[in-house]
Regions:
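Bacterial N-terminal signal peptides
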Residues: 29-39
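Right-handed parallel beta-helix/beta-solenoid
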Residues: 41-60, 77
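Short, T/G/N/S-enriched strand-turn elements that build extracellular solenoid repeat scaffolds
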Residues: 58-64, 79-88
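Extracellular beta-strand/beta-solenoid scaffold signature
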Residues: 81, 105-115, 131-138, 159-169, ...
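Right-handed parallel beta-helix
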Residues: 96-99, 120-131, 143-156, 173-188, ...
């Protein structure tokens, strides 16, 4: 009977109990209140399978989700025409593996991202996003975001027509990117901007303009990653004209930044379009940056560059020079040829 009521009303058990309380005597409200508390202890798992209505099915699950819920995509290819968005906190979105669960945006008609997240305490894991019209996954203004074994890719190879960013958390706190892969972004494959308390580890960036980029951010550790076949492997940048400036305390260690010799394919006018082909690591206008125990080689132009921001700016608060940079214990291969 309860399941029949839920099916007819379209409510979750938690919402049904909330509404029921309004019509009961105080003594019975206590009982229903205890039932509500019990229901809240258990997260709902919503399973979504590929179908002709994949966009509607997924977006409905994202809209109706409640804190603590899991939205699980089964194996298969989900062909999507519009951008997805999540603004409910405490939700986990998961697939059955980055090579098994694929959200395909090749025919995307609207939206600036594949998936947009604007809520706290979200975990994204075990799925891929392909050929998004803009950024693959953008996360903005959140606390506690995890990307675990997520893959973003533009499958037609390097092109200025590709979306700008693969994984794109910005203006966020407590960012974890672990075991991810980013391929083919026309700006940066893995990008963390204007954020603080950041870990990027065990991930791979390939055939992007910038493989991994930490920009205008505080307290970042980038380690155990591979950046290869990009224009530039790993970038630590600070730029003017942004709400958060003065990037500092970034550690880049135990990474391989090798063979980053792909021609720069950024759209005209992008700042990353100035990165020379064949760059291992660039530090620009940051302070307290430590680069150690990395393998850096076979980058045609330079293995490590420490540079001042050289463009003119009207931002009087911006400091364009790097300071307190430590580089030690790295293994260098051929460069500058």
């Amino acid at each position: 009977m309860l399941q029949m009521i839920l099916n007819v009303t379209g409510m979750s058990l938690r919402n049904l109990l909330k509404n029921l309380v309004k019509f009961l005597k105080p003594s019975n409200q206590i009982i229903v209140g205890l039932l509500f508390l019990s229901s809240s202890l258990y997260s709902a798992v919503q399973i979504v399978q590929p179908s002709e209505n994949a966009y509607e099915d997924i977006q409905e699950a994202l809209i109706l989700a409640e804190p603590g819920d899991v939205i699980r995509f089964t194996s298969g290819v989900f062909n999507l025409q519009d951008s997805l968005s999540l603004d409910i906190e405490g939700v986990q979105i998961e697939g059955e593996g980055m090579d098994q669960t694929i959200l395909n945006f090749s025919n995307q008609q609207s939206g600036a991202q594949g998936l947009s997240v604007t809520s706290d305490n979200v975990t994204l894991q075990d799925f891929s996003i392909q050929n998004a019209k803009g950024d693959a996954i953008k996360v903005k203004g959140v606390t506690n975001i995890k990307f675990l074994r997520v893959k973003t890719e533009w499958t037609n190879g390097p092109s200025p027509e590709n979306g700008a960013y693969g994984l794109y958390p910005v203006e966020s706190t407590n960012v974890l990117i672990d075991g991810c892969i980013a391929i083919g972004a026309s700006d940066a494959g893995i990008y963390v901007g204007q954020s603080k308390n950041i870990i990027v580890r065990n991930s791979r960036a390939e055939f992007n303009v910038a493989g991994i980029e930490i920009e205008n951010s505080y307290y970042a550790d980038v380690f155990n990653n591979v950046a290869t076949n990009n224009t530039g492997g790993i970038l630590v940048f600070d730029l003017p004209g942004l709400p958060q400036q003065g990037g500092h305390h970034v550690r880049v260690f135990n990474n391989r930044s090798v063979g980053n010799n792909t021609d720069n394919f950024a759209p005209e006018g992008n700042i990353v379009g100035e990165v020379p082909r064949g760059t291992g690591i660039i530090i620009q206008a940051n302070s307290n940056v430590e680069i150690f125990n990395n393998e850096i080689g076979n980058n045609d132009t330079v293995n490590i560059a420490v540079v001042t921001y050289g463009n003119e700016t009207d931002d009087e608060t911006y400091y364009p020079h790097p300071k307190s940079i430590q580089i030690h214990g790295n293994k260098f291969g051929p460069t500058g040829y």
